[in-house]
Amino acid sequence: MGQNSSERPIPTTDYKLLAGEELLRVDSFPPRHFEHSPSTIEQIKRLTNSPDTTTIGEHGPSVASLAFDVSSQTSVNPEVSPLNDQVENLSLTPDHLRLYEVLFGRDSLRVAIDLISSYPELARTTVLELAKLQGVTYNSEREEEPGRIVHEARDKDDAIAKDLTERLGWGWPYYGSVDATPEFIRTLTAYVRRTEENHAFLSQKYIDKSNTERDIAYALDMAVDWITERLSANAEGVLEFHSELEKGIENQVWKDSWDAYHHKDGTLANHTAGIASIEVQVTTYDALLDAADLYRHVLDDAHKSDSLIETAEHLKSVILAKFWTDKDGGYFVLGTDRDDNNTLRQLQIKTSNMGHTLNSRLLESNDPAIQRKRDAVVAHIASDKLLNVSGIRTLATDEVRFRAGAYHCGSVWLWDTHHIAKGLRRHGLDELADNIDRKLLHVVDTTKIFPEYVRGDDADTPSINTDRVVLWDSVNQRENIVEQPPQEVQAWTVASILAIKKRLDRRQRAIDRRKKEIL
């Protein structure tokens, strides 16, 4: 049990148990209560270590999460405990709310890309800092590879780093993700394309991990080469993950909990071979096209541009053929694994991941077959099996492993939902996208935090987990934490909410301008 938790008697009926599962313990974490809705601006300043809004991005990328600074909050709930006791409790920051106060590659890049219109400097410094940490050699403990973008950058003397090294054998910084590298390319190219600095950024110098002076164009080359090598490592040409470290992250994508990747019957994906996630393929497809455009029009390398376009088009054909099923009205499956004969198998479960195909060039086509796929995905996203009061569930309610409070198997992640809403708007589905955005704003107004995720239940009001629920899974011979409290200030949640508010402000200003023109 962590700080500020208490173990309570094990209930017999409160939690869903699958075959072979046994409830081991339930640790309670009374939530901290805040009187006012939090400020997006204040929290993004804290996350980026910026003294004011004009310096957001100047002091480096965002950390992944923080706990609220209770000294700046009115945080009293007399019904929970006597006033004096509660103030004393709130003066402490529980350990379970301080898990990710460091740089994570994918998180920082998602924050940067969501806020690039308002804070382009944040995208610049995020790309630059990650370029400095980009892999330069092969190291199994760190899962480092040349060109690979870091997953988690901790000092080796950090208390959490020491624990992970002792228990899991990780080295630092740790590179166990496959989505950070295509996200890096997408953010880099977006910054070059959309800012005044433009292609001059490609000449920006930095010192890499080998203490060698490089420029951003070199970091782009290395990231692109890492992706193309990964794609060529299998016959199908998909970007797979497979940890070579005995206790490395098993699912090296944003849904990185160990049970997130599974088959229709609940059987876990085969981790002895490569696994490919649908949203990673989609992000990689877009990253290849973005890079190709830069090579052709800025770096004057038409040959490399043509090669990347050819690779992207092949990947697109594989996505449409291998990651689509006509079952249940048709949808993009979570991903693929491999059987004992190394044959690709679909992970045929309905997840929020399918929605990521909407926020991509993948489905931008007049081809009736592709339009039917797009419409089928939208129908699933809008169904009550995925959509609830808070947003889009990570896993549909009719799937075997669905649990409303599970980390990636039923909960609602606000950044994930926001990303999908942007995709809906991209295809002209503004009304549905606006409805989903309102759900996200309602979550923050209700919980008074920027939660990492919220419950995916059928309640009328958004809520967060207050227990850590631990099961024993006899089938897979391991413990499974099926519920845990979320972080209070998750960076990509803050970025999503801030992006929504900025968009609404722009819309209102446009309306006001039109009114003035009429008058």
Task: Kindly give the residue locations of the regions a language model identified.
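PEST-like, low-complexity acidic/proline-rich intrinsically disordered segments
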Residues: 2-5
